[in-house]
Structure formats: C-alpha cells, structure tokens
A protein has these predicted regions:
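Short, solvent-exposed loop/turn elements at beta->coil junctions and helix N-caps
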Residues: 29-32, 128-133
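Acidic, metal-coordinating catalytic segment for phosphate/diphosphate chemistry
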Residues: 25, 29-68, 72-73
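Conserved Nudix-box catalytic region and its N-terminal flanking loop in Nudix hydrolases
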Residues: 3-9, 24, 66-111, 153, ...
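Active-site-adjacent beta-strand/loop module that shapes the phosphate/pyrophosphate-binding cleft
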Residues: 45-50, 133-154
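Nudix hydrolase/Nudix homology domain
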Residues: 2-22, 52, 89, 126, ...
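A short coil-to-beta-strand element that immediately follows conserved catalytic motifs
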Residues: 26, 120-127
Length: 224
C-alpha cells in the first residue's frame, strides 16, 4: 500500500496540536521532573480530544547523528563499543549526540567520523531521518552516507576516553552487514536503520538521496 501524503497538522504558539480531522491536543501544564547530563524528563498534562487530561512523561533528548561510511570496496565502517544500559558492547555506526550549539548536523557527523573511525569523507549525502521512540521521547537522529573516505594521519587522530577507549573499528561488506542484522548480530537501532537504508538506496545507485541540509522538522530544539 502506498504511503499517503502527510496530514495538514499544525502546532500553534500556545502548544496546541490540531490535526486535519479537527482533533486538538493541548498542553495545559508542564514541568521538568529530572535533569541529567544528556537527557531530561518533562512531565506534561495534555488535554485530549475528549476533554480529559492525561499525564505524559517525555524523555527530552538533544538529538543525534550517525554515519554509514562506505568505502570503494562496498564495505561499511562499524565500531564496537560498550553500552552500559544493556551491559555489553554493540556493533554500531560512528555516531554521537548534537551537543555543540549551532553545529550543523552534517558537521557533527563529520566530527564523529573523525573521532571514532579516524576518517574524513569527500562526499556526504543524507540517508535517513528517524524518530527513535516517539511514544516516550522526542529523540530524533539523522543518518548520513559518507563516501570517498580518507584516513586521518596518526598524529592528528582523536584520543578516545571512557567507553571509546577500547573501541574496535572494522570494515564489513554491506551485504554481510545486512545479513548480520537479519541474524540478530547487529541490534543497535541506528545501525539497523542506517545499514538497511544504505542497502536500499544502493539499488538505484544512490540517486534518490536528499542533500545534507534538507529540512529536518523533527529535530529536537531544546532540552526542556
């Protein structure tokens, strides 16, 4: 079934969301329940279309970027690092949060590629935009396709600390990486989405990719 055109939904300055069907969702009260180093938790009271008010807890996240770095041999660059919430290392894309004020997402992606994989890229395209888990968080991430890769000289490479100190870097054939997704060996959400998007885009020669500065309406704008 073909996807329909997006509905003509609006959000006014008072925080009232109105859908084209006439349903309204109004935030009547809001407070910050928790502030952490990266995330915060906002507690909203939302008036529903039936007039009732329900509480919604929202994990507020600054947003993130990831990179599918594809070399001339059709291999993707993967990093293997420890993730404490799941208490194990995962195979992932080079990625990071949008934590530098005013930094364009593609520049953040280039920075992460340099810091985590010791690489630069001569060509960048926008691969896919994702809402991580919209039932509980505003976290959104943008995944770029990077090509024409070059290695950063050893003297200029980033010194990694914390979870990144023992990070492993590997290049994996894109088709093999897709197989590892289906086998359950790659489970990181951004990696799954990015790799499958890259494999799909490759089918038509990467001709349908958007420019790196394409509009990103779902990008988080604040931490509270």
């Amino acid at each position: 079934m073909a996807a329909s055109e997006p509905a003509a939904n609006t959000v006014d300055h008072a925080g009232v969301f109105s859908s084209e069907t006439g349903h309204r969702y109004e935030v009547v009260d809001s407070d910050i329940a928790f502030i952490g180093r990266i995330i915060s938790v906002r507690r909203d009271a939302v008036r529903m279309p039936d007039g009732g008010v329900s509480q919604r807890d929202v994990i507020v996240h600054p947003g993130a970027v990831g990179v599918v770095a594809l070399d001339e041999a059709d291999r993707v660059v993967m990093v293997y690092q420890y993730r404490h919430p799941v208490r194990r290392p995962l195979w992932e894309l080079p990625a990071g949060i949008l934590d530098v004020p005013g930094e364009p997402p593609v520049e953040a992606a280039a920075r992460e590629l340099a810091e985590e994989a010791n690489l630069t890229a001569g060509r960048w395209d926008l691969l896919v935009d994702v809402l991580a888990s919209p039932g509980m968080t505003n976290e959104a991430y943008r995944v770029f396709l990077a090509r024409d890769l070059a290695t950063i000289p050893l003297s200029d490479q980033h010194v990694r600390v914390h979870e990144e100190a023992d990070m492993q870097i590997a290049r994996v054939d894109l088709d093999k990486a897709v197989g590892q997704i289906l086998d359950g060996a790659i489970t990181n959400a951004m990696a799954v989405v990015g790799l499958l998007a890259a494999a799909t885009a490759r089918l038509n020669g990467f001709t349908r990719l958007r420019p790196v500065d394409a509009p990103w309406p779902d990008r988080p704008r604040s931490v509270g």
